[in-house]
Amino acid sequence: MKNVCGALLLWALCSLPAQAVCHWPEWDHFRQHYISEEGRVIDPAEGRRITTSEGQSYALFFALVNDDRETFARLLDWTERQLARGDLTGFLPSWLWGRQQDGNWGVLDANSASDSDFWIAYSLLEAGRLWDNHSYSALGTLLLRRIAREEVATLPGLGPVLQPGAKGYEGEGRWTLNPSYLPPQLLARFASFQGPWGEMRALLPKLLQESAPRGFAPDWVDWQADKGWQVTADKGDTGGYDAIRVYLWLGMLSEEDPARASLVAHFAPMLAQLTESGHLPERVSSLSGQVQGKGPSGFAAALLPLSRGLPAQVTLRKQVSDHGLDADAYYGSVLTLFGAGWDQGRYRFAADGTLQPDWSESCQAE
């Protein structure tokens, strides 16, 4: 049945399958409030108006999902010119850009952020495939090779993993990792290319489950060859604003993915917290399971895919609908675009990691 939804996120209140017009008002809101005419994604937090490679990478993905080729091209052009020294084939993007001490605008930290590089490579490869654009395909392939050379390390006793960046995460036989930097869908897509990707994809369930012994993902975790998983000294065992993406990625896994059932079951305790308290926690100890605070609405959106078909889905949809999108909450808006966009049926990932966007005039909300 077709429901007419007058408010921006009123669709979220519909607990029955409903036909939703595939115009994406949340994406329009994001473009209006966060993307400059030049193609820069601006995070207004604390008045700094910074740009991160993360923001650029996510916006590229959302532009692809919405078949927005003009915005995709602007985002890519700005990313390459300002973050990659004008050449994405030769340099990984710098992760942080903003106002420098001398008042000029430019790169603030030249280190890379591998999760952003993953999403940029993925979006380029899928844009090339879906739009039949050979330039995007070639650029995505070259970027993926550079990621393999500069950001992948083979950890003794574990195997090849993605380091959070090209520098600063390895020392004295110990490596710091971020589980949320490893969307299984992306590794599945990359597995068809030459490199360590197939082995990394096979290793991922072990990495995610062992680093979250109680079913709560940590933001950061260390691997030490002779001791295994260890708490990251300067960050602790807390899972919060980074770790929320682990549940998001797992919820969006294809039903045909052989690892989906065990991963969803392992990380079910986060949804149990919603059932017990009526809200998601802001932070959780990955070792003790102790919870702190009340998570923002972006967390609710991020858990929508994982809650599919469960009573929690209705609660989460209402929380997202009641809050809507803010004009000054970049990260929460990103989580909402990912989670609510998936919940609205605007895109899916196939078992091989390929993107399945709904570019028809209407899409199916589930």
Predicted features along the sequence, with ranges:
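Positively charged n-region of N-terminal signal peptides that target proteins for export
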Residues: 1-4
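Low-complexity, Ser/Thr/Pro/Gly-enriched N-terminal "stalk/linker" regions
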Residues: 19-54, 64-107, 156-161, 195-232, ...
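Extended ligand-binding clefts on enzyme/binding-domain cores
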Residues: 21-23, 49-53, 92, 115, ...
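Aromatic-rich carbohydrate-recognition surfaces in CAZymes
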Residues: 52-59, 107-128
